[in-house]
């Protein structure tokens, strides 16, 4: 199999976690396990020409987690997708990050730049994670980071 491919993923959930921010979980036992921290996926949106690039937030047990912010028509359509739908995704894309054993990492991100840090934090040993958000209504994934260590 290639390093990446276009395949159908089953939409397990697509929930709003903050104002205009959604947490989409899609299942594909073949492609999801290939994702590395720092990679992204291209999500096909019906009636739109271009796919939407979304950072990989996490990948576990054949489930790819994509956290995205509604910014235009394409991501608005994505936010309306329902559990059980089939989602056309090209993944995993990008080189990802190389995490070296025995090193401590400091991960810094803000807003919608925070989601790809979660998968990275889970791969690191005792990472220092610093996040920032415009206001309290946009704070996301803090419990997930605590669980990651």
Locate each region found by the language model.
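Ferredoxin-reductase
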Residues: 2-83
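FNR/FR-type flavoprotein reductase catalytic core
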Residues: 73-149
